[in-house]
UniProtKB/Swiss-Prot annotation:
Protein name according to UniProt: O-antigen biosynthesis protein RfbC
Keywords per UniProt: Lipopolysaccharide biosynthesis
Superkingdom to which the source organism belongs: Bacteria
TM regions (residue ranges): none
Function as written in the Swiss-Prot or TrEMBL entry: Involved in O-antigen biosynthesis.
Gene transcribed to yield this protein: rfbC
Species name: Myxococcus xanthus
Keyword check for Ribosomal protein: no
GO biological process per UniProt: lipopolysaccharide biosynthetic process
SUPFAM superfamilies per the UniProt record, alphabetical: Nucleotide-diphospho-sugar transferases, UDP-Glycosyltransferase/glycogen phosphorylase
A family per Pfam: WsaF_C
Length: 1275
């Protein structure tokens, strides 16, 4: 992924999409979580990773398409609360769809202002309802049961009538009055019409108010009452459903339906949120409707045919495909349709063997003869004997010349691109030995129906049903290897062949297109097809022989026609450890344990009941009642982490098999554990789940589809159990999946341990799916058996909002390989991902796009990006607070011992060793340069050996620091040490003086046990670096520890000592006279103004300076030239192109020359720190314009060596005008400025500090003038 991003910058590949950025975010979040808590040696790395996370998150949000789906019904309702955010989808109709869509859009968009007014009261009700539902959801989650029904109803009832219109306008008085008049006229003229349209919505509103009244009461409604309220609002959620508008309005009903489309979706999500609040379920959904399946096909297949035709045209090799069709008394019309479908194939390299299998119908011979005469690729054979379809088919196969052989029924048809898709698939995957396609049914009128969209190769599904069915295409040599069809398996020949093929090869492909159309109720199948009973018996025999050939001892039965159950034997009686985590809910726990002990027939098991932070007395009383020796009671009282609880419990378990089971289950099938054990013992199987049902008999779990709902979902969820009709079959078949839910899953211990158990980075959701994905990656199957079931007492409404955000990101990273266009191999890309009913896919998004929309819009970090970043920064700070800490006793000891330590040093009369605590640095910036310059002069002039301790970056190399400093102050460096851990400060050698150089280092100096005097080299007032809060307070505390201060500038000394009463000395900074001097070159031309502009540093007043300079340039034009430097920024982006020239970052040696080429220098200093910038410009004879800062008055005197300005645009502009227009003023100020700076030298300042420290001369503080504001002396 990272290589892809790198390649983009070089133009090698297409730019990353939203899915790629989401993957980057997911991986970065995972890496950051792995670095919690932050270790000192990883601090810089973690900061860099957080910066990368911010960048990737910004790219993700910029790349997102509009739309999305909320994580929970309540979030989705909030997103849909504005009913007037119209969006009309394209019609699904194949004919006339464009016209219908245009009419709807014309009606909705053309009258949009009036529709907005019409729906405004309803929008107000929607927003109020969301607020109430949010409040009640939080209220109940906290366990509060006070009666808030009066408040809740008062929020909703006054807004419940959607036709109480009050028209206003945001426009001016005249225009607003006209617009308001038009809207009022529309509403009142059409009032009766609109009331009829909104009557159904009004009833829904009132029903919802009554439901909220019940939900907000002191007593929770009972189950029956809760279901009744949910059913009431559910029945009314479609505003126009079941209603016919009066009179002439009927013809416009579909148009009004589009106006209310979004409101209908809001109603549906609100009903789910209400059901969740009441702890009940909505009414079960119906199996998906397939009424529009022909139109669905017509809208999609022409493009597929064209694409296949174009792909075939590009082929350099076209293999020959042989079709074999036994013909016996087929309908003339249907046979001609079959012939026409093959003749119209867009792939031309085929042959067709039509085998006349003793037909008696007089038209058959004529049709077959005509077909062969008309088409040379058709050959007609006569079967050698009568009445055996398998033998006739094999005779056709024996005559084939093609590379691949396919089987086609005489009355069935193929899509025009069927053979093209087959050829393309075999050429794209030359390892394939065979493939099959999706299919549908064909009635007598030629209408397509009953589609069956199949999964990819699923061996356990094939043992439940012949799901491959029609249009199996096999490599000829593979078919010869297994001997073709076998006689004696009437009605199950295809199933038997597929089972034998699966024994010969695992290279089985699947084309996910309905290319085969099987005739329903044909004459041929009725006259010659085996009856269901015969076919079922043949299928049982085929499966039994297959298992015997595979060396598997198992019993095959048939629970329903042409459906099978393979009952694998339990080998021995291995012990099963059933692991049940729980927190209270004694009612659920009693149901589970009592039913498990009473119902389970399997004899050898233990139940590990793992309490996680249970607190209710009833729970503990229940546990005390149970004395069955099979019950093992454990406690895991740590913060909830579902995979961690189960991993820990698995280590306590003694069984060979581990069964993870939710506490809200109920056992109803005595053989449930026998079935799970028998499946789990199969060596090719990694994990086994089973069917879970809600108490009312609908499906809660029958497998997991990765990509459904964007992450992972349960197909058939809440559909009735049994052989219901969906395009994906039903839940009566045992299937393979990528995963099953850990609510009930069994694994062999050695398999579980070889995987390392569940991934504990997950907390609540996703670890079970991720485990299944790892099992599949290792070549082990995941099975969901349909042969047993449990009752799952889980809430049936969505609770995705209860899932930690980290689980979403971890899930995305794990699931992504199966989220794209191909999707989950055990599902089908033509089936819906936005619902769980396995209906037709009518949405364009794949699983990745759905997931990315959730991640980019609906998870907490997406809804509050700044809050997420703030949380990460604050968490980082919290993890380091231990290093920035002292007790009151430690602070008091430091303050009380400071005078004695200072007196002892002064009595000694010299400083022999100093230890400086400095932060790690990459380049030598001004503050660092001052520290090492000071140390260098202390050594050369006063004999002080200085050692340096890098305290904040454990991974830095001492040699790197030495090399960086040696270039500027070769005599400054003594020993350089790096603190690998905070406690390593105790190992430092003794020193006369230990100096902190930043507030973070003051805590290390405090804990230095062998420091003589503790000092503080103060170059800024660091609390002002932060907003008032924790960092600011932590910084401020360091000035009250009794350290001896050495202050950079008298102004900073005055400020800090005035606030905190520190004792210490100050020094004036000097400049490097070789770089900064007043020997200015002669220059002519416009007055040149320099501005130190850094947009990313707020204390430099970038906006204020840029505004004043741009205006100055506009006023004076070519008479003035404005230059800026200090950072890279684009003048065009700030609207000053042509007014200001930005030179960007300049090396130090270049800045002095630049200053001497400028006449006026503008800079600002809004904090208490000393700035070297005015010093350097003054040393070069520049007229400095800056703000009046009290801490800089030791240097700056208005009208004498600078111009001080009030920090407003006009104030700064006035001083700039004075400086630019008055050359004599500039000359005088520049000369005085250079002279003032030249008075100071580093040598003298170091001597001053040492005298003050050792009390060998006048205290520096005594020489400070109590200067009045120099602004008071202006003019």
């Amino acid at each position: 992924m990272w290589q892809k991003w790198a390649d983009v910058t070089q133009g090698h590949v297409a730019a990353p999409g939203p899915g790629d950025f989401a993957q980057m975010v997911a991986v970065l979040r995972k890496v950051l979580e792995e670095r919690q808590p932050c270790a000192p040696e990883q601090c810089d790395e973690r900061s860099a990773l957080e910066g990368a996370l911010r960048l990737a998150t910004e790219h993700l949000h910029r790349a997102l398409p509009d739309g999305g789906q909320g994580m929970s019904s309540l979030q989705e309702a909030a997103r849909l609360a504005d009913p007037a955010a119209f969006s009309i989808p394209a019609s699904h109709r194949a004919r006339g769809g464009t016209l219908v869509t245009s009419a709807k859009r014309a009606f909705v968009n053309g009258l949009e202002p009036f529709h907005v007014e019409m729906l405004r009261p309803q929008g107000n009700f929607n927003r109020a309802l969301v607020r109430v539902l949010e409040y009640l959801t939080v209220h109940r989650a906290l366990g509060l049961r006070d009666d808030v029904s009066s408040w809740a109803v008062a929020q909703l009832e006054p807004l419940a009538v959607p036709t109480r219109w009050v028209v206003g306008s945001h426009r001016g008085r005249v225009a607003g009055a006209l617009v308001g008049f038009a809207k009022r006229g529309y509403l009142y003229t059409l009032g009766p019409v609109l009331e009829a349209v909104l009557q159904g919505q009004a009833r829904w509103n009132l029903a919802m108010v009554e439901a909220i009244r019940a939900a907000a009461g002191a007593q929770a409604p009972g189950e029956a009452e809760a279901r009744r309220h949910v059913a009431d609002v559910e029945a009314l959620r479609e505003p126009l459903a079941g209603r016919t508008l009066p009179g002439a309005l009927r013809v416009t009903q579909p148009l009004w339906g589009e106006v209310l489309r979004r409101q209908s979706r809001f109603n549906a999500e609100s009903v789910l949120a209400l059901a969740n609040l009441l702890g009940t379920r909505t009414a079960p959904p119906q199996p998906p409707s397939l009424a529009d399946y022909p139109a669905w096909c017509a809208a999609r297949e022409p493009a597929r045919v064209t694409a296949a035709q174009e792909a075939v045209a590009r082929l350099s090799r076209r293999p020959l495909i042989s079709l074999v069709t036994p013909v016996h008394d087929a309908s003339e019309a249907f046979l001609r349709e079959c012939l026409a479908s093959v003749s119209s194939q867009v792939y031309a390299d085929w042959e067709w063997l039509l085998v006349d299998d003793a037909s008696t119908a007089p038209h058959l011979a004529r049709i077959l003869r005509e077909a062969a005469e008309r088409e040379s690729r058709i050959r007609v054979l006569t079967a050698s004997s009568e009445g055996d379809t398998a033998r006739a088919t094999n005779e056709g196969f024996a005559a084939c010349r093609g590379d691949f052989v396919g089987f086609l029924g005489a009355e069935d048809t193929l899509s025009p691109h069927a053979l093209a898709e087959v050829a393309l698939a075999f050429l794209a995957q030359p390892e394939l030995a065979l493939l099959y396609t999706d299919e549908d049914g064909l009635d007598a009128q030629g209408h397509r129906s009953a589609p069956f969209f199949k999964p990819d190769w699923s061996p356990d599904l094939l043992r439940s049903v012949d799901y491959v069915r029609h249009f199996l295409v096999v490599r000829r040599e593979t078919l010869a290897q297994v001997g073709g069809l076998r006689e004696g398996f009437d009605g199950a020949q295809g199933h038997d062949l597929m089972l034998r093929l699966s024994e010969a090869t695992s290279s089985i492909g699947h084309i996910t297109e309905p290319l085969y159309h099987a005739r329903e109720g044909s004459a041929a199948s009725a006259s010659r097809g085996a009856g269901l009973d015969t076919a079922t018996k043949a299928g049982v025999r085929a499966l039994s022989e297959h298992l015997a050939r595979q060396g598997e001892s198992a019993e095959v039965t048939s629970p329903a026609p042409i459906q099978y159950r393979v009952r694998y034997p339990v080998r021995g009686t291995p012990k099963v450890s059933i692991i049940v985590p729980f927190k209270d809910r004694p009612d659920l726990l009693r149901t589970l344990v009592d039913s498990l002990l009473a119902q389970t027939r399997y004899p050898h098991f233990e139940v590990l009941l793992v309490s996680n932070n249970s607190t209710r007395p009833e729970t503990f009383a229940l546990l005390e009642q149970w004395v069955d020796p099979r019950l093992v009671k454990l406690t895991w009282d740590h913060p909830f982490n579902y995979p961690a609880i189960n991993n820990w419990a698995a280590k306590q378990a003694s069984g060979e098999l581990l069964l993870f089971l939710n506490n809200d289950m109920e056992v109803v099938d005595p053989s449930w554990l026998d079935e799970l054990v028998s499946q789990a013992q199969r060596p090719e199987v990694g994990a086994v789940g089973c069917k879970l049902l809600f108490p009312e008999g609908t499906v809660q779990h029958a497998g997991v589809v990765v990509g459904m709902t964007g992450f992972a979902g349960h197909p058939f969820w809440r559909l009735p159990e049994g052989p219901i009709s969906t395009p994906f079959g039903h839940t009566e078949w045992t299937r393979n999946w990528l995963s099953v839910t850990s609510a009930c899953v069994i694994l062999r211990r050695e398999v579980f341990e070889s995987l390392g158990g569940f991934d504990e980075r997950f907390q609540v959701c996703g670890s079970d799916v991720e485990l299944g994905l790892r099992l599949n990656a290792q070549g082990l199957r995941v099975v969901c058996t349909a042969q047993t079931r449990l009752i799952h007492h889980e809430s049936a409404s969505r609770r995705a909002d209860a899932i930690p955000e980290a689980d979403y990101w971890l899930s995305y990273a794990a699931y992504r390989p199966w989220l794209g266009p191909k999707g989950d191999p055990y599902y089908n890309p033509h089936l819906t991902l936005t619902a769980t009913d396995c209906g037709l896919r009518r949405h364009p998004e794949d699983g990745e796009q759905l997931a990315v929309r959730t991640l980019g819009r609906d998870v907490p970090s997406a809804r509050d990006v700044r809050g997420e970043q703030r949380a990460r920064a604050q968490r980082h700070l919290i993890e380091h607070l231990e290093a920035w800490d002292f007790t009151p006793e430690q602070a008091q000891t430091s303050r009380e011992s400071a005078p004695a330590a200072l007196a002892a040093l002064r009595a000694k009369g010299r400083v022999e060793t100093a230890t400086w605590f400095v932060p790690a640095f990459g380049h030598v910036y001004a503050g660092i340069h001052t520290i090492f310059r000071f140390a260098d002069l202390m050594q050369r002039r006063h004999g002080v050996r200085s050692d340096f301790v890098i305290y904040d970056q454990p991974n830095v190399r001492p040699g790197d620091i030495e090399a960086r400093v040696a270039a500027i102050c070769p005599g400054a460096v003594g020993a350089v040490r790096v603190l690998r851990r905070p406690e390593d400060v105790a190992l430092l050698p003794a020193c006369d003086l230990a100096l902190a150089t930043a507030w973070t280092s003051a805590y290390r100096v405090l804990h230095h046990p062998r420091a003589g005097l503790r000092g503080y080299f103060v170059q800024d007032y660091e609390p002002l670096f932060h907003a008032a809060g924790t960092p600011s307070a932590l910084a401020e505390q360091t000035y009250g520890l009794g350290f001896y201060g050495i202050f950079n500038t008298p102004g900073l000394y005055e400020h800090v000592v005035g606030l905190h009463g520190m004792e210490g000395a100050w020094f004036e900074p000097a400049v490097d006279g070789t770089l900064f001097h007043p020997r200015r070159p002669p220059r002519q031309g416009p007055v040149r103004v320099f501005f130190y502009g850094r947009p990313g540093n707020e204390r430099n007043g970038f906006e204020l300076g840029l505004a004043a300079l741009a205006q100055l340039k506009r006023e004076l034009g070519p008479a003035v030239e404005v230059l800026a430097a200090g950072a890279e920024w684009d003048p065009e982006a700030y609207g000053v192109r042509g007014l200001v020239t930005n030179l960007g970052m300049l090396p130090a040696e270049r800045t002095g020359a630049l200053y001497r080429e400028c006449d006026v220098g503008l800079c600002f200093m809004f904090t208490r720190h000393p700035s070297y910038l005015p010093l350097e410009m003054m040393a070069c004879g520049v007229t400095v314009v800056t703000n009046d800062n009290p801490t800089n008055r030791w240097l700056l005197t208005h009208g004498e060596n600078c111009l001080l300005a009030e920090p407003t645009p006009s104030g700064v502009l006035a001083r700039l005008r004075d400086a630019v227009s008055n050359g004599a003023l500039r000359a005088r100020l520049g000369t005085n400025a250079a002279e003032r700076v030249s008075r100071t030298s580093w040598e003298a300042e170091v001597d001053r500090v040492m005298k003050g420290l050792l009390n060998t001369g006048a205290h520096p503080a005594a020489t400070l003038d109590d200067r009045a504001s120099s602004l008071e002396h202006a003019s």
